[in-house]
């Protein structure tokens, strides 16, 4: 069992990488999972969990269910089983479940503990660590949420055996995101090696990158912004396609390519660096056909991104390999020229 400690000002916790251990709790626990994950992994968790009382809440699977209705169901279950300030919630699932449970636990009784048990690659390397929580609204993705760190995170690679290839590749997109912005050595490892031969090491390295970033910038005031590479465009893509055509990681892969187009046009990437990232995405089948329906509407959606300030869009753009820059005040014409390539 490998451990990564994340020491923060208000709350420190550990990320455990290895077989899920027995979890003994002296309080009530509400497990929240989705309809697919519950059928695959709930019994595995229940065999390893001992608590004063356990209840299970199952939410429909999919990004479009990351909404107020699902949040209300989670909270109603918490009230019905009379969770108190010493009780906790357990998120068993991917990024959607992690985000919703984190948010629900942050507002229930003004904040109770929760444990993350991520079952997708995307959630293991990104969503389950760092304390960003939230739900989607008709206006955009993750526009309502909070920073609420988990009590602990348990990453068990056995969960990944049931993942469809598409879900797995979506998680790889988030690994590439972190590598391009923070760690050129990880980029080289992904380029040179078969991921099957070094998966545990890559997951550990990715979580460690995320942990180091969160330790330096828990509330996303500066360096943590790099974790949003591809997300300004990606969230607009998800909204335009009603969260149904692409998985989150797939939309982010497209968003990274759009960001690369913008970075290339601004001279932040050389053509060689641009092609290197393209080739890495292609290696993991993360090149998708996407056509913007209405360029002006898509452009306007970019302003709904949480990073936008004073009617200015902020983009996280790669600056070479292993670094990034927050770029703002980019002329509208420059952005539209990039979007035209995708129209």
Curated annotation (Swiss-Prot):
Keywords: Amino-acid biosynthesis, Aromatic amino acid biosynthesis, Cobalt, Cytoplasm, Lyase, Metal-binding, NAD, Nucleotide-binding, Zinc. Pfam families: DHQ_synthase (PF01761), DHQS_C (PF24621). It is found in: Cytoplasm. One of its GO terms (molecular function) is 3-dehydroquinate synthase activity. Disulfide bonds: none annotated. NAD(+) binds at residues 61-66, 95-99, 119-120, 132, 141, 159-162. This is 3-dehydroquinate synthase. It comes from Helicobacter pylori (strain P12).
